[in-house]
């Protein structure tokens, strides 16, 4: 089993290195169809050289030279002091108060009368159900794999 894993990883590494070392012009990612009808469809979809001559060609250098030399972050700048909504602050306070116990405590009736209180209650119920579901899934997955003492070498 270990030998198979090592061969698989070596094959993956060799393939990755081979693809990385090829120039971009030589990289072939298309699968070659063996069916005659599939080859006919692909041959119809290919663009003739006459159509290519009509299109203006843009070299890679042209694309690079037109781009500004500014590096931008894809993320928005984060505010150092974010303003949290009141419901999130209340939820954090409730979590800190019930940190020692796993069971959720019942909220005061005044909290349940507001929509924020109702949303918090639903959120806590969903979180509790999700935690139970995750625990059951992990327990099931652990039961699928035999303990190390039961594994027999071939």
UniProtKB/Swiss-Prot annotation:
Tissue: Highly and specifically expressed in the lactating mammary gland.
Primary subcellular site in the record, as a coarse category: membrane
Annotated Gene Ontology cellular component terms: membrane
Residue spans of biased composition, Basic and acidic residues class: 51-65
Domain of life from the UniProt record: Eukaryota
Cellular localisation: Membrane
Glycosylation sites noted in the Swiss-Prot or TrEMBL record: 34, 96
Membrane topology: Peripheral membrane protein
Keywords on record: Glycoprotein, Membrane, Phosphoprotein, Signal
Spans through the membrane: none
Chain positions found as Phosphoserine: 48, 53, 57, 59, 65
InterPro entries recorded: GLYCAM-1 (IPR007906)
Pfam family, one: GLYCAM-1
Signal peptide: 1-18
Region feature (Disordered): 51-115
Family assignment from sequence similarity: Belongs to the PP3/GlyCAM-1 family.
Protein name from the UniProt record: Glycosylation-dependent cell adhesion molecule 1
Organism: Capra hircus
Gene for this chain: GLYCAM1
